[in-house]
Curated annotation (Swiss-Prot):
A Pfam family matched in the record: DegV
SUPFAM superfamilies per record: DAK1/DegV-like
Binding site for hexadecanoate: T62, S94
Protein name as it appears in the record: DegV domain-containing protein spr1019
Residue ranges occupied by any DegV domain in the UniProt entry: 4-277
Molecular function GO labels: lipid binding
Organism per entry: Streptococcus pneumoniae (strain ATCC BAA-255 / R6)
Length: 279
C-alpha cells in the first residue's frame, strides 16, 4: 500500500512529540528581525521570539518558504514512492499554500496541497487527523474527506490586546470593520471564510471575560471533540480559560505558546481558542 506523508508549515502550533510520533514534516517560514533572518524552526524555545520582537527597532517581517524548498522536500519525501498531502495555513494570511502548489508542480512527487482555511492549532487539528489516518493506511480520498469534515467543524477565535502589529503588518485590511486608529483596544475576532471578523471590542479585561462567558454558554449545547488554547506573552489568561473550558470537552485542552509567525501579527498578550466539534 502506498504510504501517504503529511506536510504542513511552521504556522502550525503543535506539540513536538506529536510531530515525531505521527511523522509530520513541517516546512519552516522565516522571520526577519532588524535585518537578521531566522528560520522559524530556530525560534521555538518558549519566549525566545517575543524577547527578540520586544528588543527590535522594527516590526519583524515573515516570509513564506521558497518554492524551491517545497520542491526539494516533496522530492525527498517521495524517493521511495508514495503520496504527499500538504496542509497549509489560509492563503489570506500568507502565500505559503501557493508556494507549496508551485513547489509541487516543479517536483516529480505525487502531491495534493490543501488550504486549511486556518492556522495555529486549528491547522493542527487537520494535520493530526490526516497523519493518524495515514498511519492507519487509509487512502488519499478517505483522508481528504475527513480533513474537509474537520475543517467544516472547526472554529478559530483570536483575542488581541493591541491592533498595532496587525496595522503595521498590513493585516488590518483583512480585519473587516475596525478603525486602525483604535490601536490600544482589546478585540476578539473569529476567522471565518479566510477573514478575521471582529466579534467584540473594548478597553478592559472584562472584554475578554464577557466574550468567554458567551462562548461557554454556546458550548454547553454542542458536542466538542477538542479544544486548543494558544497564547503570546504571559500564559495566565490562557490557563484561566482552560480551567473554564475543560468541563466542556473530554480530551485534555492543550495550552501552547504560539509561534513567531502568529506572534508577529498579533503582538504580545494575544490568545486564541481553537475548537473542533464532533461531526
Amino acid at each position: 500500500m502506498t504510504k501517504i506523508k503529511i506536510v504542513t508549515d511552521s504556522s502550525v502550533t503543535i506539540e513536538p512529540e506529536l510531530v515525531k510520533q505521527l511523522d509530520i514534516t513541517i516546512v519552516p517560514l522565516s522571520v526577519m528581525i532588524d535585518n537578521v533572518v531566522y528560520s522559524d524552526a530556530d525560534l521555538k524555545e518558549e519566549g525566545k521570539f517575543l524577547q527578540l520582537m520586544q528588543e527590535s527597532k522594527n516590526l519583524p517581517k515573515t516570509s513564506q518558504p521558497p518554492v524551491g524548498v517545497f520542491a526539494e522536500i516533496f522530492e525527498d519525501l517521495c524517493k521511495d514512492g508514495g503520496q504527499i498531502l500538504a496542509i497549509h495555513m489560509s492563503h489570506a494570511l500568507s502565500g505559503t499554500v501557493e508556494a507549496a502548489r508551485q513547489g509541487a508542480s516543479l517536483s516529480t512527487a505525487d502531491v495534493i496541497v490543501v488550504d486549511s482555511s486556518f492556522t495555529d492549532q486549528a491547522l493542527k487539528f487537520q494535520v493530526v487527523e490526516a497523519a493518524k489516518l495515514a498511519q492507519e493506511g487509509k487512502d488519499m480520498e478517505a483522508i481528504l474527506s475527513h480533513v474537509e469534515e474537520v475543517k467544516n467543524h472547526t472554529e478559530l477565535y483570536i483575542g488581541v490586546s493591541t491592533l498595532e502589529n496587525l496595522v503595521k503588518g498590513g493585516r488590518i485590511g483583512r480585519v473587516t470593520g475596525l478603525l486602525s486608529s483604535l490601536l490600544n483596544i482589546r478585540v476578539v475576532m473569529q476567522m471565518k471564510d479566510h477573514e478575521l471578523q471582529p466579534m467584540v471590542k473594548g478597553r478592559g479585561t472584562k472584554t475578554f471575560k464577557k466574550w468567554l462567558d458567551e462562548l461557554i454558554t454556546s458550548l454547553s449545547e454542542r458536542a466538542v471533540a477538542e479544544i486548543g488554547i494558544s497564547y503570546s506573552g504571559s500564559d495566565d489568561w490562557a490557563k484561566e480559560m482552560k480551567e473554564s473550558l475543560q468541563a466542556y470537552v473530554e480530551k485534555p485542552i492543550s495550552v501552547l505558546e504560539t509561534g513567531s509567525i502568529i506572534q508577529t501579527h498579533t503582538g504580545e498578550n494575544a490568545w486564541a481558542i481553537l475548537i473542533r466539534y464532533h461531526s
